[in-house]
Amino acid sequence: MASIRDVARKANVGSATVSRVLNNSGYVSEETRRKIEDAMRELNYTPNELARNLFHKKSGIIAILVPSVSHPFFAELVKCVETELYARGYKTMLCDTFREKNSEQEYLDMLNRNIVDGIITGVHSLRIEEYTKIDKPIVAFDRCLGENIPLVRVDHALGGRMAAKLLLASGCKDVIQFQGAKSVRSPSDIRHIEFERVMKENNAKVTSVELMWNRFDSEYFSEVTEQTMREHPDIDGVFGADLLAVYCMKAAIAQGRQIPGDLKLVAYDGTYVTDAVTPGITSIVQPIPLIARELAGLLHDMIEQRPIPQREKLMNVSIRYGNTTIGKN
C-alpha cells in the first residue's frame, strides 16, 4: 500500500507538500498540485481519512438521535438522512433513545468532546438547557430546543385541519384521535388542537386518547387501540399516526365493522405501512425525503460555519387518498 512518502518521491516533492494538498492547507502551485494528484492516481494512493479528520479537528461522523428505529416514520427518516449525509461526505452513528435510557446525554457529551461533528435529534428526554448550553452544531426535527438550534418541521396545523375535513366530508360525527403525552410539549401538538377545533365547529364529537410518553412499540399500539375500540364501539372515525390507524382498522374488522362504511380512518405520517394494508389508509403525508434534505443541509452549513438565516424551516404536508374515507381516491 502506497504511503505519503511514496507519493512525494513519485512527484519529486517533499512529504509536507503532499500533506498540504491532502489537507487543502497552505499554498501549493497548480503545477505541483497536478503532479501530486497524478502520482496519487498512479500509485492508487488512498488518504488516511482518520488522520485527515484529526488534522481538521473533525471526525466526519454525525449522530442521529431518534426515539425508536422500529417506528416506521423514524425508520424512513433515518434512512433518508443517512443518504443525504453520505452525499455530503459524512458517516452516521445511530442512537435509539427508547432502548438506551442515558444515550441522549452521552451523545451530547460526545459532541462536546469532538467525537462527532454534529447531532440531528428527534428526541427530547433531556431538559432544553442541556442543549442550549452547548455551542456546537445541532439541528432538531419537530423539537423546540431553543432559538439558537435550527428546527425542521411540517405545518402540523394544516395537517390537523386536513384530517378533520376528510372525516367531516365522509360524514363522521363521533371520532377518536390519538395524541402524545401532554406532559411533553412538541410542535406536533397543534395538529390535535386544530383537528379538534375544526371537528367541534362542525358539531362533531371528539374523544382524545392520550398515549404514554416515549412508547413507540407495536405491542403498546396494539394494546391501546384494541382497548379504545372496545370502549368506544359507536365511533365512526379515527385520526392517529400510521401504526395507530392500522391497528384500529385491524380491531374494527375483528369486531365485524366495515371500512369505510362503519368506520373511517385518517392516518398521519404517510409511511409505507398505510399502503401495505387492505384497504389502503387515507393519510396526511409528511415529506420525509425533503425533511431529511433540510436536516442534513442545515447541519452541514453549521459545521462549515455558514450563516443560517432561517432558524425554522416549515414544510407542507399533503393528502394521499386511500380507501378508508369517502370521496376522492
Which residues does each predicted region cover?
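Alpha-helical recognition/docking segments in bacterial nutrient-uptake
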Residues: 2, 60-165, 227-234
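Short acidic capping loops at alpha-helix termini that bridge into adjacent secondary structure
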Residues: 174, 206-208, 259-264
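Flexible loop/turn connectors
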Residues: 226, 230-239, 243-329
